[in-house]
Each structure stands twice: as C-alpha cells, then as structure tokens.
Curated annotation (Swiss-Prot):
E.C. numbers: 2.7.1.50
Gene that specifies this protein: thiM
Cofactor entry: Mg(2+)
KW ATP-binding (keyword) present: yes
Known pathway: Cofactor biosynthesis; thiamine diphosphate biosynthesis; 4-methyl-5-(2-phosphoethyl)-thiazole from 5-(2-hydroxyethyl)-4-methylthiazole: step 1/1
UniProt GO MF annotations: ATP binding; hydroxyethylthiazole kinase activity; magnesium ion binding
Protein name: Hydroxyethylthiazole kinase
Any one Gene Ontology BP term: thiamine biosynthetic process
Length: 267
C-alpha cells in the first residue's frame, strides 16, 4: 500500500470508528478544534475539571493535552488525565504551546514529558527545539539549509525522548528517532487563523486512535490536513472564508482525491 492509499485508509477508519478524543486544550481554540474533530468524523469531548478528567480520559480512544492557556489547575488536570490514559493504554498527544517562551511554560512542558508517557509530541520548530535543548538553533528557519537542520533536530528529539515527534511548518517533519518523513502539503492561510496548529494536533490524535503506529498516524493526519488546507484556500477570499472552507473540505475530502493529492517524502 503506497502512502496515498495509507492516508485515505486511515481517514476512512476515523470516519467508520468515530473515536472519542478527550481534549484538555486552551480557551482560544476550543470551538475550532472541537469542530475540526467533528468534521473529520471523530467525537470531541472538552473536559478539564480535575474532578472528572481521569474518568473522561479512560472513556476516550485518545487524549490531547494542549498548554496554550496555562494555569496551575490546567497543569494538574493534564497530569491527572495523562496518567489515567497511560494506565489504560490510551495514547496521549501533547501540544507544548509556547514552550521556550517563558520559564513556566518550559518547566511545564518538561514536567509533563517527564511524568507521562507521550505517544506523539506535536509542535512548531521553536517549541520542539526548546524541549529538546536546542535553544536558538531554529532561529531563521526559513533561511537556506534550515529545513535540513529542523529535520535533524526532529529525529534527535524523538530519539532522546523515545517518542514520535511531529513538527509542523511550511514542511512538516515526523520521526520516531529512526524513520524520518516530510509532508509538503499545506497552505500559508493556515497561519492567519488561530488554532490551526492545535487542530493539527486534534487530527493526529484521532488518527492515532485508529492506527497503532504513531509515525503512520501523524504522517497520514498531516498530509490529509495539509491537502484540505490547499483545497480550502483555492475557494477562499481570506482567513474567514478559509476557516469555513477548511471545515467543509475536511468533512468531504476522502478516497481517491485524497490519495492522489498527498505529498509525502521519506528522508
């Protein structure tokens, strides 16, 4: 089965199995990520009360931890949900929003990674570089040669943390420390709508719920999402119409059209 067929197959699995994805996410993106999760055929739940997060995590097929709007209570809730998911064998996808921006965010990201088993770590290059101890090595990621450095960094962080790392940007890179894959689908309009990175994390979690291999799940999810962004941008006039078109395209994109449009490279 080639990559196009694998992407279409995993997208179909999500549609058929409708996995429940428990989100502890940030206040800015809750509505968009819930709607994206619904549009792809999965079921979102957005529960963050400490009194119920462990119970909710055990009901889910995947758990998303997103530290975008961080408080002490949110950190505690994420740890409770993550430990419950770990004990039940439910995959945890962690989005370390803003890691490296403040000491609190950096410490929190490190604490979550230390105390939980993270199946997939999804972030941008600077967030993952901060977590991996690469400091400012991703400064100027659009400069000549920078994509190669980002790819190497992704593979090294995945190896060091013994997890799957997915870095999203103009090109997405996915690695488990051994395999390294690039996804070239996407569109610049994604950067003009708040929550599109967080939505990528939600889609990865839904795909991981129906696919045991984290590299395959992340690659398929990001190729599908990136192609949907390309199709949505083609019928949009700007960020507002793009957001609506993106939800519609995620809902409709499947099968042969999806398989033919993905741009995936093995590195």
């Amino acid at each position: 089965m080639n990559w196009g067929e694998q992407v279409a197959s995993r997208r179909q699995r999500v549609h058929e199995q409708r996995p429940l994805v428990h989100h502890i996410t940030n206040l800015v993106v809750t509505n968009l990520t819930a709607n994206v999760t619904l549009a792809i055929g999965a079921s979102p739940v957005m529960a963050y009360a400490r009194e119920e997060v462990a119970d909710m995590a055990r009901l889910a097929q995947a758990v998303v931890l997103n530290m975008g709007t961080l408080t002490g209570d949110v950190v505690e809730a994420m740890l409770l949900a993550g430990k419950a998911a770990n004990n039940a064998g439910i995959p945890v996808v962690f989005d370390p929003v803003g890691a490296g921006a403040t000491p609190f965010r950096t410490r929190t990201a490190q604490k979550i990674i230390k105390e939980l088993h993270i199946d997939i770590l999804r972030g941008n290059a600077s967030e993952i570089a901060s977590i991996g101890g690469f400091g400012g090595h991703t400064k100027g990621v659009d400069a000549a040669g920078a994509p190669a450095r980002v790819a190497e960094m992704v593979k090294q962080v995945a190896r060091d943390l013994n997890t799957v790392v997915a870095v999203t940007g103009a090109t997405d890179y996915i690695s488990d420390g051994e395999r390294l894959i690039a996804v070239d689908n996407g569109h610049p309009l994604l950067t003009f709508v708040t929550g599109t990175g967080c939505s990528a994390t939600s889609i990865i979690a839904a795909f991981r719920a129906v696919e045991e291999d984290g590299v395959t799940a992340s690659t398929a999810a990001l190729a599908y999402y990136g192609l949907a962004a390309e199709r949505a941008a083609a019928v949009s006039q700007g960020p507002a119409s793009f957001q609506v078109a993106l939800l519609d395209t995620l809902y409709n994109l499947a099968g042969e059209e999806l398989a033919r449009g993905v741009k995936i490279r093995l590195l």
